[in-house]
UniProtKB/Swiss-Prot annotation:
Protein name listed in UniProt: Neurotoxin-1''
Originating organism: Androctonus australis
GO MF assignments: sodium channel inhibitor activity; toxin activity
Gene Ontology cellular component terms for the protein in this record: extracellular region
Subcellular location: Secreted
Keywords for the protein's UniProt record, in alphabetical order: Disulfide bond, Ion channel impairing toxin, Neurotoxin, Secreted, Signal, Toxin, Voltage-gated sodium channel impairing toxin
Function per UniProt: Alpha toxins bind voltage-independently at site-3 of sodium channels (Nav) and inhibit the inactivation of the activated channels, thereby blocking neuronal transmission. Is active against mammals and binds with high affinity rat brain synaptosomes.
Family label: Belongs to the long (4 C-C) scorpion toxin superfamily. Sodium channel inhibitor family. Alpha subfamily.
SUPFAM superfamilies assigned to the protein according to its UniProt record, in alphabetical order: Scorpion toxin-like
One Pfam family from the record: Toxin_3
Disulfide bonds: 31-81, 35-53, 39-63, 43-65
Claim: Zinc-finger is one of the keywords in the record: no
Length: 83
C-alpha cells in the first residue's frame, strides 16, 4: 500500500499541475493590455478560454481574461506599471 501512495505522489510531481486563473493580462512590466486589439483573441492566443474589455482604475479599459495558464502574467496590484 505504501508503494502505491509513493508511486502516485511521484507521478503527480512529474506530471505537474497546471492551474487556470482569471485576471487582467499584462506585459512583463506589469502594464495592462488595452482593449485594442480585441481582448477575446488576445486571451485565446495566450491560452485563455475567453476575454472581454473591462474598466480597471487607474489604467482605464483593459483586457480581462478567463482561464489563463500560470505562465501568462496577470496584473499584480502590489506592483506598479513601469514603462
Amino acid at each position: 500500500m505504501n508503494y502505491l501512495v509513493m508511486i502516485s505522489l511521484a507521478l503527480l510531481l512529474m506530471i505537474g499541475v497546471e492551474s487556470k486563473r482569471d485576471g487582467y493580462i499584462v506585459y512583463p512590466n506589469n502594464c495592462v493590455y488595452h482593449c485594442v486589439p480585441p481582448c477575446d483573441g488576445l486571451c485565446k492566443k495566450n491560452g485563455g478560454s475567453s476575454g472581454s474589455c473591462s474598466f480597471l482604475v487607474p489604467s482605464g479599459l483593459a483586457c480581462w481574461c478567463k482561464d489563463l495558464p500560470d505562465n501568462v502574467p496577470i496584473k499584480d496590484t502590489s506592483r506598479k506599471c513601469t514603462r
